[in-house]
Amino acid sequence: MNLYLDDLRPTPEGFERVYSYSDFVAYLKCKGLPDFISFDHDLGEGLSGYDCAKYLVDYCLDRQLPLPDFAVHSQNPVGKENIERLLNNFKEQQKTILKAI
């Protein structure tokens, strides 16, 4: 399953959509990790896509799960870079841990 996090853009074919941080958290709690997540950064008022990415990292750490594949489709260049940096750093950390085991 593919997950699309965005409050405005149309949902691409083959994706389930969540609009907000609370939707994102509820999706993971109910359905678990998708195979792929496409992130927007700016989600209107409230928490952002970066907050969703932080939740995802904690979710994976707590459950000892690998990070799913992801992309960031946000038009906000700073927000996009922040999400990519967080998730790519976590992905590298997971690789290092697996090599040590």
Whereabouts are the PLM-identified features?
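Catalytic phosphate/metal-binding cores of nucleic-acid and nucleotide-processing enzymes, i.e., regions
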Residues: M1-I101
